[in-house]
């Protein structure tokens, strides 16, 4: 016979961004708790609102499964003394298992007998295990926690109720400073306290109190209501996934409505209006069928449709205040002079250990000069790049960006266009922030891409130089994201820029404001980002590519993919082993690897030397790999017929030189001795 378990924790309003991860964590930890306690179940469903986290287990076994475990103890010769009595070692072993020496038996393993005991544990009724759910709740982790009411413990928010039900059976458990009961709280304004009748009646009991406990149902309600408004008014409403997830975690009983604002505000750049609505007010944007922004918005209230007109007016009033600010800053910022703002950046600190933003821009400008040549920019692109690098942070001192920091770069583009700069310069100023997340949008223009790379590289090198290096998960200056951005842009544009050579060039630059330090750490940091970009590629293949001599990001990623693609083929293992053997022996070569044909003693070493001399890796990575693997029979024949470590030192070094030249060329693809073929 199975049962159903409900656990609900009622709290003060949770931050929206915490709700979904906490709900997921609760479900995962409950599943682990049940598994650990040998309780089978059919399904786990989680619930959440801003004021509660809950989990329900259905089809829960009414008792633990019985447990039978065998334990191996000391050898018989240690367990028995000369008189055949059990020694202290044997007695201590069984005592530790809660058994006696009478439970001992001997079993033979590989010709020697050992003490064994079998421990049987009869499963307890589920009612005896349920109190342990309190430990599940205590184990939840949160990004921030707090104290309240003079208590010593911490939790995400003060706890008000705890409900634990096994079908209809109530458990009055203690959690923090709360006594458990079947009482739960309804909607803060529309509902009241209610008793949950059973684990299976949970949603309906709360629904009567204007609480929709299932977030999936709340989400669908919001989407359906928005689509109904769309159909009624003939408009298009952008349902942004992140905004939808945030909004559903702000309400317990959602009701969507449409508000409006004066059309005069549409003269302000669209990005300002959208930011005001989405980022600051959590409103959905409304457009006409052609995609043109309309003077309307969609909001979702935490309640029903009663007095909705008053709610709409209140939301409109709040939004207008934001739009007034935007209109004011848009008008006033156009009076500013870009060169004046750039000069003022001398007084804006980039970081107290690094210097000003203006100094950061100057270093970035010098880096763009190097990159422009390596990326093959045209003369016009190079001119645009130089201009963009000279002014690209100016908008940080505009009123608009001061009020809406999400618009940095975006407003820079608009203000530079108004000032008569070229579209390429303006676009680069916007694009230099890209990507803003791990999978974020990348720059489209070459000028923007180079500026983005240069800006990020100076940021990375500057922070590393003053010892502000990320450790563990701690990365307060988002240097991992910046490095990932550099790697992604290089890969996307397919620029054959060797990162090791580029970093060497950057460390050779001279600045008045800063000297780059910690180059080795920077290189390791960049390699770690390339490693991450290789995704699920086997670790040994990653290590082989990263250990190679080619640090062109696009080439490295392509090489890893090529190796993975053929790793299951029959020829992969012997081909890699041949090259790997060559790599291992080549390490013994001394000095400059020159080959003297006069020292050849057989046709096989001559054949390998000629094959190596004519080897030129070219084309896509898959083709280069075929070229290398094609050498496998030649390498094998060389090893079968040639004693590499010959007694004659000159002959030995000559043979090692052949292998050294081979591996030097192969290492441009990967270090094959890092690949595991076992």
Curated annotation (Swiss-Prot):
Its main location: cytoplasm. It comes from Streptococcus pneumoniae (strain P1031). Belongs to the class-II aminoacyl-tRNA synthetase family. Tetramer of two alpha and two beta subunits. GO terms for cellular component: cytosol. InterPro entries: DALR_anticod-bd, Gly-tRNA-synth_bsu, Gly-tRNA-synth_heterodimer. It catalyses: tRNA(Gly) + glycine + ATP = glycyl-tRNA(Gly) + AMP + diphosphate. This is Glycine--tRNA ligase beta subunit. GO terms for molecular function: arginine-tRNA ligase activity; ATP binding; glycine-tRNA ligase activity. It is found in: Cytoplasm. It holds the Pfam family DALR_1.
């Amino acid at each position: 016979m199975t049962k159903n378990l409900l656990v609900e924790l009622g709290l003060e309003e949770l931050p929206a961004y915490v709700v979904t991860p906490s709900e997921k964590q609760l479900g995962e930890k409950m599943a682990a708790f049940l598994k650990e306690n040998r309780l089978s179940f059919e399904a786990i469903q989680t619930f959440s609102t801003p004021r509660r986290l809950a989990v329900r287990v259905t089809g829960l076994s009414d008792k633990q499964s019985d447990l039978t475990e065998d334990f191996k103890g000391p050898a018989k010769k240690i367990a028995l003394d000369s008189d055949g009595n059990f020694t202290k070692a044997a007695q201590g072993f069984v005592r530790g298992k809660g058994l006696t020496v009478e439970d001992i038996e001997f079993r033979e393993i590989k010709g020697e007998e050992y003490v064994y005991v079998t421990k049987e544990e009869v499963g307890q009724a589920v009612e005896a295990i349920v109190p342990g759910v309190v430990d599940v709740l205590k184990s939840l982790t949160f990004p921030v926690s707090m104290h309240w009411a003079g208590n010593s413990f911490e939790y995400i928010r003060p706890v008000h109720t705890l409900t634990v039900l096994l079908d209809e059976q109530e458990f009055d458990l203690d959690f923090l400073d709360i006594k458990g009961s079947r009482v739960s709280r309804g909607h803060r304004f529309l509902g009241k306290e209610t008793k949950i009748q059973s684990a299976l009646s949970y949603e309906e009991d709360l629904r009567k109190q204007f609480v929709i406990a299932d977030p999936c149902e709340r989400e669908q309600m919001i989407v359906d209501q928005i689509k109904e408004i769309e159909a009624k008014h003939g408009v298009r409403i952008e349902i942004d996934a992140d905004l939808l997830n945030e909004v559903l975690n702000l309400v317990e009983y959602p009701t969507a409505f449409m508000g409006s604002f004066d059309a005069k505000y549409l003269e302000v750049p669209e990005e300002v209006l959208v930011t005001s609505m989405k980022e600051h007010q959590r409103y959905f944007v409304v457009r006409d069928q052609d995609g043109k922004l309309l003077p309307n918005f969609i909001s979702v209230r935490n309640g029903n449709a009663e007095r909705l007109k008053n709610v709409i007016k209140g939301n409109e009033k709040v939004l207008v205040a934001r739009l007034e600010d935007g209109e004011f800053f848009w008008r006033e910022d156009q009076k500013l002079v870009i060169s004046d703002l750039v000069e003022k950046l001398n007084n804006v600190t980039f970081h107290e250990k690094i210097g000003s933003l203006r100094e950061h821009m100057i270093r970035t400008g010098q880096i763009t000069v190097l990159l422009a040549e390596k990326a093959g920019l045209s003369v016009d692109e190079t001119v645009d790049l130089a201009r963009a690098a000279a002014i690209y942070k100016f908008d940080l001192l505009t009123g608009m960006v001061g009020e809406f920091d999400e618009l940095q770069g975006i407003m820079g583009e608009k203000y530079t266009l108004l000032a008569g700069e070229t579209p390429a310069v303006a676009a680069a100023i916007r694009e230099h922030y890209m990507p803003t997340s791990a999978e974020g949008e990348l720059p489209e223009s070459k000028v923007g891409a180079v500026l983005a790379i240069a800006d990020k590289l100076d940021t990375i090198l500057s922070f590393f130089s003053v010892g502000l290096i990320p450790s563990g998960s701690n990365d307060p200056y988002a240097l991992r994201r910046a490095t990932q951005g550099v790697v992604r842009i290089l890969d996307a544009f397919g620029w054959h820029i060797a990162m090791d050579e580029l970093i060497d060039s950057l460390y050779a630059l001279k600045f008045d404001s800063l000297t780059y330090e910690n180059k080795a750490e920077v290189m390791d940091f960049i390699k770690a980002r390339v490693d991450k970009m290789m995704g699920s590629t086997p670790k040994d293949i990653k290590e082989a590519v990263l250990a190679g001599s080619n640090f062109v990001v696009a080439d490295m990623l392509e090489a890893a993919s090529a190796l993975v693609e053929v790793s299951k083929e029959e020829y992969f293992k012997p081909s890699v082993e041949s090259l790997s053997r060559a790599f291992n022996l080549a390490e013994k070569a001394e000095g400059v690897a020159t080959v003297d044909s006069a020292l050849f003693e057989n046709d096989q070493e001559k054949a390998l030397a000629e094959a190596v001399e004519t080897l030129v890796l070219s084309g896509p990575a898959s083709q280069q790999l075929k070229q290398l693997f094609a050498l496998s029979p030649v390498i094998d024949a060389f090893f079968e017929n040639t004693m590499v470590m010959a007694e004659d030192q000159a002959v030995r070094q000559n043979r090692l030189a052949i292998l050294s030249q081979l591996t030097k060329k192969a290492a441009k693809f990967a270090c094959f001795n890092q690949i595991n073929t076992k």
